[in-house]
Amino acid sequence: MTELSSEARAIVEGRHSDPFHYLGCHRETDRKVVRVYLPDASEVRLIDETGEEIILTRIHDAGLFLGDLPDRAERYRLRARYGADLVELEDPYRFPPILDDFDLYLLGEGTHQRIYDKLGAHPMAMEGVDGAGFVVLAPNARAVAVVGDFNFWDRRRHPMRVRGNGYWELFIPGARAGDRYKFAITAQDGSLLPLKSDPMAFAAEVRPNTASIIFDQARLPRPTPLAATINARGVPISIYEVHLGSWRRSDGNRWLSYRELAETLPDYVRELGFTHIELMPVNEHPFDGSWGYQPTGLYAPTSRFGSPEDFAHLIDACHREGLGLLLDWVPGHFPDDPHGLGRFDGTSLYEHANPLQGRHLDWDTLIYNYGRTEVVNFLVANALFWLDRYGIDGLRVDAVASMLYLDYSRPEGGWIPNKHGGRENLEAIEFLRRFNREVFGRFPNATTVAEESTAWPQVSRPIEFGGLGFGYKWNMGWMHDTLSYFEKDPIHRKHHHDQILFGLHYAFSENFILPLSHDEVVHGKRSILGRMPGDDWQRFANLRAYYAFMFGHPGKKLMFMGAEFGQEREWNHDHALDWHLLDQARHQGVQAVVRDLNKLYREVPALHEFDCDPAGFEWIVANDADHSVFAWMRKGASGRARCLVIANLTPTIHRDYRVRVPFTGRWREALNTDSAHYGGSNVGNDGAIETSGEIIPELVLTLPPLGVIFLVPEAA
């Protein structure tokens, strides 16, 4: 055996950053030399295009072989002996690069909108040879190799080469869709890191296994398109929030698959009148108890419920029912599981190195470094990926407040101010603006929603006017105030009248969604029904009234699964909803009132056209605290598009209650939550009522106990 050069030694020791510089075919003065590294092979032959075989010389026991390629030959294959077996294979180090110069330029700038076409693992053919191309970012690594089903998980066999800006790549002949793989990374100090999953993996193993899976994105079907106005501010938007693992389950408490869900979920949601489904995070994640909010695979739909094609099938099933599909998206933090993004290349690549910036104290997770162009590119492209490849209709961004504030949930002295000495995360602000700019730039009919729990201004206002550029914002203040009010015994509500009034002072400062989300039915808060006071009759009456109050209030609507039929228990992600409750009439009544509220909301323009515009709202009765009565007029674009909403939030019937209205004539009682159909006492106004009063028209009404009524003027 000859003494190895320093370059050959680096190959054998797995620390060469450009194995192509040594391996493969190279012209040396007057000959073409082929160097091959095949650990454990006892003999290697080179087969040129004519079929001629050339025995390569073994130059090191580690598996280095050397030989000459005839000048006439352009391509070659290898035949290697492993024990008694002869194996024909292609040499990965004879193929051209995967990334071109333009890719490298855009990646360096951090402006490559379609990194999912290049990074990760892609089945492809090079020079007529089938295989898969692998590209990964690891700028501070000494060496990176691909390990997987195609090479016995041996980190010696497929070292990658580094290109510009720290992107490593390799085409591996014979690797194919369905193969599992990971990256074996050597840090600069020579230490071997835990095998890493691919940050750009498009599929992954079911937990607790953590390997990435090669997936061909060309297999994804294109979903049925929806109307361009599906997310517009002037249309009804009523969202059903779902956790796929616990909506329903099969025998033995087994999860339903994406395809099983596609057979039932969209039809159920459409039949109840919702316009959208919002899925809690489906990105791959290791811990069931995180509900998906601690993802390790942003580009892979979780394999718990099936394949990427199966998930695309579920989206298409929603679209075929006319339902928009929103995904919860988590660009704020990620877990520090060893196979994940944390210290990916031996350094804090995706996260801040300083724990005062890089670790979230509430969740013990890592925080993305929005000051790195590669990280921002990775996240923004991920949002575009779901819209482009899967055809979803929008993204709800989780925990925006934790991104915006450097001192979020941190003690005094436990955070680092920005360059101006303030607590605003300037890099996160720019990231969110870029995210919205690029989403709406490429997908103008999509929407984005912010879960932002503070009073940060202009979250859903245009970027050019100083806003963050979101389409909508969750109205957390409305949710807290109204739940607090409705939880109180009706006898005390008159002392808290302002909790209802206050929300209208800011109801149009943003494009709001009124959220009754999963966060309100966990951690000891009880279910929505469980928070309602009184005996059983009053609890259900309060619940129906609360939902009607929500649908009559300005703002788009969101309801977490189970709330639509009065789930009694808190939500538990390990079990299905209590569907057996629908055997009881009172729960059927709750479901029926939600169905009818959705129908009314869709069909009455006054209830949705100006959801986000003060022109669509007028208080009629705001100061009757003694009776806990509220009345307001919702207005639409046309002159007679009106809907009067009246809420009596005590168990006392109020008769001869006078309310002024803009039009004389007959007003139809479009919905009454106290109807016997819903389980109420059937107190109301016989379905319609004529105005009285010659100068100022008014309605003399009977207000049902713990009830809300909707009245619309009949055609003149």
Curated annotation (Swiss-Prot):
Keyword Nucleus: no
The UniProt record lists the keyword Transferase: yes
Functional pathway: Glycan biosynthesis; glycogen biosynthesis
GO BP annotations, alphabetical order: glycogen biosynthetic process
Catalytic activity: Transfers a segment of a (1->4)-alpha-D-glucan chain to a primary hydroxy group in a similar glucan chain
Stored CDD domains: AmyAc_Glg_BE, E_set_GBE_prok_N
EC annotation from Swiss-Prot or TrEMBL: 2.4.1.18
A GO CC annotation given for this chain: cytosol
Pfam families per record: Alpha-amylase (PF00128), Alpha-amylase_C (PF02806), CBM_48 (PF02922), GlgB_N (PF22019)
Enzyme class, spelled out: transferase
Keyword terms of this UniProt record: Carbohydrate metabolism, Glycogen biosynthesis, Glycogen metabolism, Glycosyltransferase, Transferase
Molecular-function annotations in GO: 1,4-alpha-glucan branching enzyme activity; cation binding; hydrolase activity, hydrolyzing O-glycosyl compounds
Catalytic-site annotation from UniProt: D398, E451
Similarity remark: Belongs to the glycosyl hydrolase 13 family. GlgB subfamily.
Subunit structure: Monomer.
Function: Catalyzes the formation of the alpha-1,6-glucosidic linkages in glycogen by scission of a 1,4-alpha-linked oligosaccharide from growing alpha-1,4-glucan chains and the subsequent attachment of the oligosaccharide to the alpha-1,6 position.
PANTHER family: 1,4-ALPHA-GLUCAN-BRANCHING ENZYME
Protein name: 1,4-alpha-glucan branching enzyme GlgB
Organism of provenance: Nitrobacter winogradskyi (strain ATCC 25391 / DSM 10237 / CIP 104748 / NCIMB 11846 / Nb-255)
Name of the gene: glgB
